[in-house]
Amino acid sequence: PQNFPRSDATDKTGYDGHIKFATEGSMQMHLAEQDFDVAARNGRHINPVERGHIAFRTDNIEAFKAHLSANGIEYADYGTAFAAEWHQIFFYDPEGNIIEVHQQVA
């Protein structure tokens, strides 16, 4: 079962795959069902559930997006397509790994 509010995503938009959680203290791992088409359905160039990613939380996602743009780093802004309470963006690190940065939204 999901333990966070999902957006009104369907199989045509957003992401409605199954997600499992493993928690140890303040650390949490999400195991998400692979979806090769989520980027295309959302008009984005990065697919965070194609091969996995690592995530970090921020208190100011707009400042983080401005920092990425100022440094010429492209990112995909999924907003709340995956989780109703989290604004998520994704970008590639220099090694080609997908990085997520998210902020809780009210």
Give, region by region, the residue ranges found by the protein language model.
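N-terminal beta-strand motif that seeds the catalytic metal site of vicinal oxygen chelate
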Residues: N3-P5, R51-F56, V105-A106
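Short, charged/polar, Gly/Pro-enriched secondary-structure boundary elements
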Residues: S26-M29, A39-A40, G96-I98
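A short, acidic/glycine-rich surface segment
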Residues: N3-T10, D37-N42, D77, A84
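Vicinal oxygen chelate
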Residues: I19-G25, R41-A106
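Generic beta-structure capping elements
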Residues: G25, A32-Q34, Q104
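Core segments of cupin and vicinal oxygen chelate
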Residues: P1-Q28
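Histidine-centered active-site/metal-ligand motif
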Residues: H30, H53, H102
